[in-house]
Design a protein with these regions (language model features):
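Preference for intrinsically disordered or flexible, low-complexity segments
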Residues: 1-137
């Protein structure tokens, strides 16, 4: 698991501005943008209201979110999934990322409802680049 920094009051204010809502279930800051603001938050696998939440690494940096949204809108997930089917080394690396994601989430808590489910389509397809970029950062 990457180093997770504690959340400050300034972080919460920045996250509210980034998200347009109050952040939920934040465990800490997993990545900071160049300006020092949160870029990726680590989120509890169970939200305060009891809802299971498989997205451990939630991308919040507005510039990165916008860039990833542009790439997603171009439909690259289909091509990326095709590459996973054709390239055994790439598929093995993607499976390893899936396992690492599950291990990171397990370190934050065990939630039976989402056991074995990572995020972003892992390990067999590419579904949500926001999750994958958040994990990579």
């Amino acid at each position: 698991m990457p180093t997770i920094e504690p959340v400050t009051e300034a972080d919460v204010a920045a996250l509210e501005a980034q998200l347009g809502r109050q952040p939920r279930g934040i465990v800490g800051i997993a990545y900071r943008c160049a300006n020092g603001e949160p870029g990726v938050v680590a989120t509890s696998p169970r939200l305060p209201d009891g809802t299971p939440f498989p997205t451990t690494y939630y991308l919040t940096c507005p510039r990165i979110v916008a860039a990833v949204s542009t790439v997603e809108s171009e439909g690259v997930m289909v091509e990326m999934t095709r590459r996973l089917e054709q390239d055994a080394d790439l598929a093995a690396a993607y499976r390893a990322a899936h396992e690492a994601y599950l291990a990171d989430r397990a370190a934050l808590g065990d939630v039976e409802e989402i056991a074995g489910i990572s995020a972003g389509g892992m390990p067999s397809r590419v579904k949500c680049l926001h999750v994958l970029v958040g994990h990579a950062l």
